[in-house]
Amino acid sequence: MTNIRKTHPLLKIINSSFVDLPAPSSLSSWWNFGSLLGVCLGVQILTGLFLAMHYTSDTATAFNSVTHICRDVNYGWLLRYLHANGASMFFICLYLHVGRGLYYGSYTYSETWNIGILLLFAVMATAFMGYVLPWGQMSFWGATVITNLLSAIPYIGTDLVQWIWGGFSVDKATLTRFFAFHFLLPFIVAALVMVHLLFLHETGSNNPTGIPSDPDMIPFHPYYTIKDILGFLIMLTALSTLVLFSPDLLGDPDNYIPANPLNTPPHIKPEWYFLFAYAILRSIPNKLGGVLALVMSILILAIVPVLHVSKQRSMMFRPLSQCLFWLLVSVLFTLTWIGGQPVEHPYIIIGQTASVLYFLIILVLMPAISLIENRLLKW
């Protein structure tokens, strides 16, 4: 008799995706981050659901409702900090996942890659709107500054901003709609994840060598399920440590001050995971130029497959490209640091230099080095 997991209409889909899925035998720990992101999404949806049961999306009570969750709800403090720091873990895994794709040439699976970019935008939008909900000083002013950027769009900009605000400033209508979208978007993200996996399973996984691995495949279960579970344990240990020992380490102290439209904080900045893009935005003195640079800092990922001119897919055997890749990583760390600094000398010039380097490495230096490597290998 055939096993039920192979015949049942629903179970056989799960079986072909997570049990009998043929996977390359050489996948390293860098391939763990996809499953870790799935766990992060699950944790965020679950904790968010319970938080939404106690949260009120009204400017008069939003801040107090978060205080009530932390003080009066059973384990409310744990839910709140798991959700806030879970977002940080989500972005750490997300950036490592994208970095893995860039390093090993996974972007040549263009459908999977493009859905991934859509997912990145959706998760960033969700995180931004979530940051507004506690209605602290940084929530209010962050929302004001970032939504105001849309006014740089010619002709329709001002009307667009007022339409998003639901009035002439960030107020009750803005908070209510942000809560609605913050609740809805994770489910859209979950649907996009299904599409992401669907396209991935059409081609099969890439591997560290970048060489087709069809002759050497192993079943996903038990080999990679055990490996993924180890990843879950490490990540959940790190998240628990962060939540239980220093829950406010990655947050901003200004967000413990209730939102006040009459008092601007000295340094308005987003959460740490957006600081690199914020630094790129600030490094251009022109408003529209800054907004375009901000969007392009993420959208540039979509043109990476077009710029792939190397005869080898992975960077595993390309030391010159590896040097450039790690230079790009250090530039991103520099931008993240600059994004959290005030706009003054020498931070302005460091930010501008790092921004130019960021685009230069991806658009010019990477393809140029790939061509040089091709010549060195007489290809």
UniProtKB/Swiss-Prot annotation:
Give membrane topology per the record: Multi-pass membrane protein
> Which positions bind heme b b562?
83, 182
- Where does the UniProt entry say this protein principally localizes? mitochondrion
In the UniProt record, the signal sequence range is: none
Listed GO CC annotations: mitochondrial inner membrane; respiratory chain complex III
Needed cofactors, names only, are: heme b
Which cysteine pairs are joined by S-S bonds?
none
Q: Which residues bind heme b b566?
A: 97, 196
Pfam families per the record? Cytochrom_B_C, Cytochrome_B
Q: What are the UniProt keywords, alphabetically? A: Electron transport, Heme, Iron, Membrane, Metal-binding, Mitochondrion, Mitochondrion inner membrane, Respiratory chain, Transmembrane, Transmembrane helix, Transport, Ubiquinone
UniProt entry tagged with the keyword Cell membrane:
no
Q: Where in the cell is it found?
A: Mitochondrion inner membrane
**Which PROSITE patterns is this protein grouped with?**
CYTB_CTER, CYTB_NTER
According to the record, cofactor stoichiometry and binding are noted as: Binds 2 heme b groups non-covalently.
Query: What family does this chain come from, according to its entry?
Result: Belongs to the cytochrome b family.
Additional remarks: Heme 1 (or BL or b562) is low-potential and absorbs at about 562 nm, and heme 2 (or BH or b566) is high-potential and absorbs at about 566 nm.
Functionally, this protein is described as follows: Component of the ubiquinol-cytochrome c reductase complex (complex III or cytochrome b-c1 complex) that is part of the mitochondrial respiratory chain. The b-c1 complex mediates electron transfer from ubiquinol to cytochrome c. Contributes to the generation of a proton gradient across the mitochondrial membrane that is then used for ATP synthesis.
Record note on quaternary structure = The cytochrome bc1 complex contains 11 subunits: 3 respiratory subunits (MT-CYB, CYC1 and UQCRFS1), 2 core proteins (UQCRC1 and UQCRC2) and 6 low-molecular weight proteins (UQCRH/QCR6, UQCRB/QCR7, UQCRQ/QCR8, UQCR10/QCR9, UQCR11/QCR10 and a cleavage product of UQCRFS1). This cytochrome bc1 complex then forms a dimer.
**This protein's name:** Cytochrome b
Encoding gene, per UniProt annotation: MT-CYB
